[in-house]
Amino acid sequence: MLGEQAYLDLCKQIFKTGEQRGDRTNTGTHSIFGHQIRFDLNKGFPLLTTKRVPFRLVASELLWFIKGDTNIRYLLKHNNNIWNEWAFEKWVNSADYQGPDMANFGLRSQKDENFNKQYQEQMELFKTRILEDDSFADKYGDLGSVYGKQWRNWKTTQNETIDQLKDVIHSIKTNPNSRRHIVSAWNPEDIPTMALPPCHTLFQFYVSNGKLSCQLYQRSADVFLGVPFNIASYALLTHLIAHECGLEVGDFVHTFGDAHIYSNHVEQVETQLEREIRDFPQLIINKDKNSIFEMDLDDLVIENYNPHPSIKAPIAV
C-alpha cells in the first residue's frame, strides 16, 4: 500500500498487534518492531490530509538541520516551538534556574491545571531570554550534537569534521550509481551530549532513470505526532536535493524500528482513522535558487493543501 493509506494502515497495525510497553517518558506505548511505508513523490507532496500538518514548521526545522544549527534560537525566530521542551528541560534542571519546581513538567502539565499555568509562564520567560540574551541562548538554547551537527560537522578521531550532507550531494552529482549515498546522524560517541539521541538515524539516496529516491531508517517513531513531520521533512529534503542535482523525484521509503503510539494519543489516532483521505498538495520550489544551502523558508510554497482539521496531543519528553 502506498501513500497516506499506508500510514493509516500502520496505525491500525499497531492497534491490532502492538505490544503494550513502558518507555523512557513513563507515558506507555503500543509498539511494533519493523515496518515500512512508501510514497511516490510524483503523486503529490506527502503532507498528510487526515489531519493538518504545519508545513512551515516542517520546513523551518529542516532548514535548521541543513544549516548545521543546533540552537533553538533560529527556530524561535521562525515561530517554531517543536524543540523547546528539550532545551527547557536542560534549563530547569540547571543550578542557574531559581524558579518553581518543574520536575516531570511534561506529564504534570497534562494532569495539573495550576501547574500547567506555571509551566507555560516559565516556558514563555525561557523563550524570551533565548531570543534576547545571547549568552543565555548559547548556554541553554543549544541542544548539543543533534541532527544539524552530525549532518554538517561530524567530528572524526583526527579532530577534523565531515560535511556529510555536502558530500552526499557531490556524490549524487558525480557518481549517481553509487551505493554509498548515505548520511548518518547516529554517532555513538556523541549520544551522551545530545538533548535527544537521533530518532531518524540514517538515510540513503538512490538514483534511477533520472529520479532521486530516499530511504530513511527511523529507530524510534512517535507515529501520531512525529511521523507525519518526518514524512514531510524527508520528502522535502529529497525534493531539494533533486532540485540541486537536476533530477526528478522518485520514492520516499520510510523504514521503522520501534513504531509506537503513546497511550495518551489513542483517542486522537482513532479520530484520525475515521477521516477520509484527500489529495496531496503540490510543492513549489523557487527556481531562481539552486543550492540547498541557499534556500530560505519563503523559497518553499505548498499549494492546494486541503486537510482535515489539526488534532492536538501532548508531547512525551
Curated annotation (Swiss-Prot):
Q: Which PROSITE patterns match?
A: THYMIDYLATE_SYNTHASE (PS00091)
What Gene3D superfamilies does the record tag this protein with?
Thymidylate synthase/dCMP hydroxymethylase domain
Extract the InterPro entries matched here.
Thymidate_synth/dCMP_Mease, Thymidate_synth/dCMP_Mease_dom, Thymidate_synth/dCMP_Mease_sf, Thymidylate_synthase, Thymidylate_synthase_AS
Q: Where does this polypeptide localize?
A: Cytoplasm
> What does UniProt list as catalytic?
C199
Residues the entry annotates as binding (6R)-5,10-methylene-5,6,7,8-tetrahydrofolate: D222, A316
| Binding positions for dUMP per the UniProt entry | R24, R179, R180, R219, S220, A221, D222, N230, H260, I261, Y262
Q: What class of enzyme is it?
A: transferase
Q: Which UniProt keywords apply?
A: Cytoplasm, Methyltransferase, Nucleotide biosynthesis, Transferase
Short name of one Pfam family: Thymidylat_synt
* Source species, domain of life: Bacteria
Select a single GO molecular function from the record's annotations and give it: thymidylate synthase activity
Q: State the reactions this protein catalyses.
A: dUMP + (6R)-5,10-methylene-5,6,7,8-tetrahydrofolate = 7,8-dihydrofolate + dTMP
GO CC terms in record: cytosol
**Record text on subunit structure and interactions:** Homodimer.
List, alphabetically, the NCBIfam families matched: PRK01827.1-2, thym_sym
Q: Which family does it belong to?
A: Belongs to the thymidylate synthase family. Bacterial-type ThyA subfamily.
This chain's function reads: Catalyzes the reductive methylation of 2'-deoxyuridine-5'-monophosphate (dUMP) to 2'-deoxythymidine-5'-monophosphate (dTMP) while utilizing 5,10-methylenetetrahydrofolate (mTHF) as the methyl donor and reductant in the reaction, yielding dihydrofolate (DHF) as a by-product. This enzymatic reaction provides an intracellular de novo source of dTMP, an essential precursor for DNA biosynthesis.
- What is the name attached to this protein's record? Thymidylate synthase
Source organism of the structure: Oceanobacillus iheyensis (strain DSM 14371 / CIP 107618 / JCM 11309 / KCTC 3954 / HTE831)
Give the encoding gene's name: thyA
